Protein backbone atom coordinates (compact mmCIF):
# COMPACT_ATOMS: atom_id res chain seq x y z
CA UNK A 1 0.00 0.00 0.00
CA UNK A 2 2.96 2.28 -0.56
CA UNK A 3 3.17 4.70 -3.44
CA UNK A 4 6.54 5.88 -4.65
CA UNK A 5 7.47 8.73 -6.94
CA UNK A 6 10.80 9.11 -8.66
CA UNK A 7 12.97 11.98 -7.56
CA UNK A 8 16.22 12.95 -9.31
CA UNK A 9 18.19 9.96 -8.03
CA UNK A 10 15.99 8.06 -5.57
CA UNK A 11 12.44 7.10 -4.75
CA UNK A 12 10.44 8.78 -2.02
CA UNK A 13 7.08 8.02 -0.49
CA UNK A 14 4.26 9.99 -2.08
CA UNK A 15 1.66 11.63 0.12
CA UNK A 16 -1.11 10.33 -2.16
CA UNK A 17 -1.97 6.77 -3.15
CA UNK A 18 -4.65 5.32 -5.36
CA UNK A 19 -6.57 2.32 -4.05
CA UNK A 20 -9.68 0.91 -5.69
CA UNK A 21 -9.85 3.97 -7.91
CA UNK A 22 -9.84 6.41 -4.98
CA UNK A 23 -7.01 8.83 -4.22
CA UNK A 24 -6.14 8.68 -0.54
CA UNK A 25 -3.54 10.50 1.51
CA UNK A 26 -0.68 8.36 2.75
CA UNK A 27 -0.31 8.04 6.53
CA UNK A 28 3.07 6.78 7.66
CA UNK A 29 3.18 3.56 9.65
CA UNK A 30 4.50 5.46 12.68
CA UNK A 31 1.47 7.76 12.73
CA UNK A 32 -1.12 4.99 12.59
CA UNK A 33 -3.01 3.36 15.44
CA UNK A 34 -2.16 -0.35 15.38
CA UNK A 35 -4.72 -2.72 16.93
CA UNK A 36 -3.84 -6.38 17.53
CA UNK A 37 -6.38 -8.96 18.69
CA UNK A 38 -5.41 -12.54 19.48
CA UNK A 39 -7.98 -15.30 19.87
CA UNK A 40 -7.97 -18.71 21.49
CA UNK A 41 -10.02 -20.32 18.71
CA UNK A 42 -9.36 -24.08 18.88
CA UNK A 43 -11.51 -25.32 15.97
CA UNK A 44 -10.04 -25.10 12.45
CA UNK A 45 -13.52 -24.73 10.95
CA UNK A 46 -14.20 -21.74 13.23
CA UNK A 47 -10.88 -20.18 12.20
CA UNK A 48 -11.83 -20.57 8.53
CA UNK A 49 -15.28 -19.06 9.06
CA UNK A 50 -13.78 -16.14 10.97
CA UNK A 51 -11.11 -15.63 8.29
CA UNK A 52 -13.80 -15.39 5.60
CA UNK A 53 -15.63 -12.74 7.63
CA UNK A 54 -12.36 -10.81 8.09
CA UNK A 55 -11.88 -10.81 4.31
CA UNK A 56 -15.41 -9.48 3.88
CA UNK A 57 -14.78 -6.75 6.45
CA UNK A 58 -11.58 -5.72 4.66
CA UNK A 59 -13.58 -5.26 1.46
CA UNK A 60 -16.73 -3.72 2.99
CA UNK A 61 -15.46 -1.30 5.67
CA UNK A 62 -16.74 2.25 5.16
CA UNK A 63 -16.80 5.49 7.11
CA UNK A 64 -18.28 8.60 5.54
CA UNK A 65 -18.52 6.73 2.23
CA UNK A 66 -14.87 5.66 2.02
CA UNK A 67 -12.81 2.73 3.28
CA UNK A 68 -11.14 3.75 6.54
CA UNK A 69 -9.17 0.69 7.67
CA UNK A 70 -5.68 1.46 6.36
CA UNK A 71 -4.44 -2.10 6.71
CA UNK A 72 -5.89 -5.39 7.91
CA UNK A 73 -4.09 -8.71 8.19
CA UNK A 74 -5.54 -11.85 9.75
CA UNK A 75 -4.77 -15.53 9.96
CA UNK A 76 -4.07 -18.56 12.10
CA UNK A 77 -1.04 -18.22 14.38
CA UNK A 78 1.93 -20.41 13.63
CA UNK A 79 2.29 -23.17 16.21
CA UNK A 80 5.05 -22.58 18.72
CA UNK A 81 6.02 -22.76 22.39
CA UNK A 82 5.16 -19.08 23.12
CA UNK A 83 1.62 -18.93 21.74
CA UNK A 84 0.00 -19.51 25.16
CA UNK A 85 -3.01 -21.03 23.45
CA UNK A 86 -3.68 -18.15 21.04
CA UNK A 87 -4.48 -19.62 17.64
CA UNK A 88 -5.69 -16.71 15.49
CA UNK A 89 -4.48 -13.11 15.09
CA UNK A 90 -6.06 -10.03 13.52
CA UNK A 91 -4.12 -6.76 13.10
CA UNK A 92 -5.73 -3.56 11.88
CA UNK A 93 -4.28 -0.10 11.32
CA UNK A 94 -6.19 3.17 11.53
CA UNK A 95 -5.41 6.81 10.75
CA UNK A 96 -6.65 7.97 14.15
CA UNK A 97 -7.98 6.90 17.51
CA UNK A 98 -11.38 8.18 16.36
CA UNK A 99 -11.35 5.74 13.44
CA UNK A 100 -10.49 2.89 15.80
CA UNK A 101 -13.32 3.88 18.16
CA UNK A 102 -15.71 3.95 15.19
CA UNK A 103 -14.50 0.46 14.26
CA UNK A 104 -15.14 -0.84 17.77
CA UNK A 105 -18.56 0.74 18.31
CA UNK A 106 -20.28 1.69 15.04
CA UNK A 107 -18.78 0.00 11.98
CA UNK A 108 -21.37 -2.30 10.33
CA UNK A 109 -18.65 -4.47 8.74
CA UNK A 110 -16.98 -5.03 12.12
CA UNK A 111 -20.42 -5.64 13.61
CA UNK A 112 -20.77 -8.61 11.24
CA UNK A 113 -17.41 -9.92 12.45
CA UNK A 114 -18.60 -9.66 16.06
CA UNK A 115 -21.74 -11.63 15.15
CA UNK A 116 -19.60 -14.49 13.86
CA UNK A 117 -17.53 -14.39 17.06
CA UNK A 118 -20.74 -14.92 19.01
CA UNK A 119 -21.50 -18.06 16.98
CA UNK A 120 -18.14 -19.86 17.17
CA UNK A 121 -16.01 -21.29 19.97
CA UNK A 122 -13.72 -18.69 21.55
CA UNK A 123 -11.85 -19.72 24.70
CA UNK A 124 -10.29 -16.29 25.21
CA UNK A 125 -9.12 -13.17 23.47
CA UNK A 126 -6.85 -10.21 24.07
CA UNK A 127 -6.78 -6.84 22.31
CA UNK A 128 -4.06 -4.20 22.52
CA UNK A 129 -3.57 -1.01 20.53
CA UNK A 130 -0.70 1.44 20.25
CA UNK A 131 0.98 4.17 18.24
CA UNK A 132 4.55 3.14 17.40
CA UNK A 133 7.41 4.80 19.22
CA UNK A 134 10.05 2.96 17.18
CA UNK A 135 9.97 1.72 13.59
CA UNK A 136 12.50 0.08 11.33
CA UNK A 137 13.22 -2.74 8.97
CA UNK A 138 14.84 -3.44 5.67
From Swiss-Prot:
SUPFAM superfamilies the record matches: Dimeric alpha+beta barrel
The source's domain of life comes to: Eukaryota
Q: Which InterPro entries match?
A: Dabb, Dimeric_a/b-barrel
- UniProt xrefs under Pfam families: Dabb (PF07876)
Coiled coil, from the record: none
Which part of the chain is the Stress-response A/B barrel domain?
33-130
The pathway is: Secondary metabolite biosynthesis
What is its biological role?
A: Part of the gene cluster that mediates the biosynthesis of the lipopeptide fusaristatin A. Fusaristatin A consists of a polyketide chain linked to three amino acid residues glutamine (Gln), dehydroalanine (dehydro-Ala), and beta-aminoisobutyric acid. The biosynthesis starts with formation of a linear polyketide chain by the highly reducing polyketide synthase PKS6. The gene cluster does not contain an acyl-CoA ligase or an acyl-transferase, and it is therefore predicted that the polyketide is transferred directly to the nonribosomal peptide synthetase NRPS7.
Protein name per its UniProtKB record: Fusaristatin A biosynthesis cluster protein FGSG_08206
**Can you name the source organism?**
Gibberella zeae (strain ATCC MYA-4620 / CBS 123657 / FGSC 9075 / NRRL 31084 / PH-1)
